Amino acid sequence: MVAFGKKLKERSIQEWQGYYINYKLMKKKVKQYSRQLEGGNLERRHVLKDFSRMLDNQIEKIALFMLEQQGLLASRLQTLRGSHDALQEQPDISHMSYLKEEYRAVGQDLLKLLFFVEMNAIGIRKILKKFDKRFGYRFTNYYVKTRANHPYSELQQVFRHVGLGAVVGAVSRNLHELQNNQGSYLSIYDQPVLPLQDPVVDSIRAAVDRLTRSTNFLHFMAQHALIMQEELPSPQDEEGEEEDGRYHFMSLLLNLVNTFLYMVNTYIIVPTADDYSMSLGAAATVCGVVIGAMAVAQLFSSVYFSAWSNRSYFKPLIFSSIVLFIGNLLYALAFDFNSIAVLLIGRLFCGLGSARAVNRRYISDCVPLKIRMQASAGFVSASALGMACGPALAGLLQIRFKIYKLTFNQDTLPGWVMAVAWLIYLVWLAISFREPAREPEEIPKTSEESNHSAVQDVNLEKGMKQPLLLTSEEIEEQGEDECDGSEEASEDSRTPANSILAAYRLLTPSVKVQLLIYFMLKYAMEILLSESSVITTYYFGWSTSSVAIFLFCLGLTVLPVNLVVGSYISNMFEDRQILLVSEIMVCVGILLSFHVVVPYTVPQYVCSGLIMFVSAEVLEGVNLSLLSRVMSSRLSRGTYNGGLLSTEAGTIARVIADATITVAGFFGRNMLLNVTLLPSLVICVLSIVATCFTYNSLY
């Protein structure tokens, strides 16, 4: 892993070198502070004051240069505006082409400025993170709170690129006008065939979205998948050709279908799980164990599927389909065997076939960057659609008949239908999936060996390129670079974590809080969904069809809610603000769900459940967005990646929630609702408190 300081130097725009954050100087000062504090020669108060002043100066330098460049771009646009107006009066094809090229040139310079701002924003985040890590302070919280919220904030100039929006709008609008030839031609027959989009405008929009982390609907949906991108921007997509060679549309489609079918498989039994349990001689609340058995097995399957995807995508998907076919077959046959054990084994098999880790990994590794966001949004949409279709399908399977000794009814038909679905999918997979080409495998090294080797390689390469005799200044600079590289290799190495323990060590307080929030929302949602059939039957006498319709309606809210949040709300408020409000709304939904004194009514249950579910859906998107932002880049690849950690946190929450339902059954059905909601309330309050403590580090 090349140190960030080196990457900053390599990727920076040469003529603007003096205006970038002096990352090397800031790192040197952090080391100096550390030595002085250890020697007792410096007070902590002086360190904070001096470092704040240095960082303020660096940000001021960046912000003022941004304003200067914006002024130059605005001046050029103003000049072009006059030529554009003249063109409207006297149309001229050659002059129009000239204007388009001039606007594109401004667009290219605007791209350079956006790239400049993004590199500096990353540098500021990294130096703040390094300072906190070195001294154990919560300096980032203090600095962001005092600077970002100030009315004359220069920090906001960098992180919110204040003023650049007008330049982006002017370039885009004028190019669009010229491209659509408004007033430029006397006759429609003279109009050539022009592309609908200009590449420069597309590049500018992509750069702005990346810089602001703007969450339009597509981006907001994609964040649910927690498929992390490279942190450092690059003017060109260096991996584009390689990714295009590995990408295969039908293989991507098969991964998305796998995601959809698995979510259908998860939720298709929810409306009838209590009835199935009672028909086999168990209590209705054993439905918690039946539903949760799949999640228990998924705890283990997520790990081995994630590891397996390092070597192949096709074989894990084949194995997943076979295991899910067997699991659903056992689930369906449990009725005729009159065995709760066979039922549970069937659900365990279904959990062992969870290939969501493979689906995520395929999108992350094989889908080209230009369509990865669409693929990630497709992954989330497939999950949401499966979640809605599962209960709806169960509501349609209200028939009963026998073929020989096999019983087909509302309890067993979900198993039979899913077994047939997985069998068809298996055949399609075997025919259409194409295994992507892989790079030659390297002998794995320990992180210590990798870091040492990386530093040695850098030193050797530099030794071959540099002259034999160096000046004392050059020697000192080289020594600092080597030290920086060594530190970056040990602290910010991009080598993937090679164990759960190694991954856990990479979790900062902010990441731990986000994982706690993810645990909380999955726990609350699982309680709501899994006990819905028992609660509604006890209080309201609902039939299986009524429960299925209720769950189907909940599932249908996912996409519209994300559309509203992703397209509007997230563009008006910061992610951390939406996060905190969503947590509070989940807490409100939980409180409204309690059965206290008044008779429990359908409106109370439906409204409180809707508030809880919708708020949790909004919370999930924002939570995973922030999680991908604050998580170490070492967790973006490998077996023990961020996606696996979030999946495990959510799965553990589901397991505990389903176990809670079964245990609460011993208190009687009249106590089930309140007993299961109490842990949800406690965890939700804890997550709100934890969010408040880490609020200023979520940026």
Curated annotation (Swiss-Prot):
Residues 2-145 form the SPX domain. Residues 475-494 are annotated as: Disordered. InterPro entries: MFS (IPR011701), MFS_Domain-Containing_Protein (IPR051068), MFS_trans_sf (IPR036259), SPX_dom (IPR004331), SPXM_SPX_plant (IPR045264). Pfam families: MFS_1, SPX. The chain crosses the membrane at residues 249-269, 280-300, 317-337, 339-358, 377-397, 413-433, 515-535, 546-566, 578-598, 606-626, 671-691. Keywords: Membrane, Transmembrane, Transmembrane helix. This is SPX domain-containing membrane protein At4g22990. It comes from Arabidopsis thaliana.
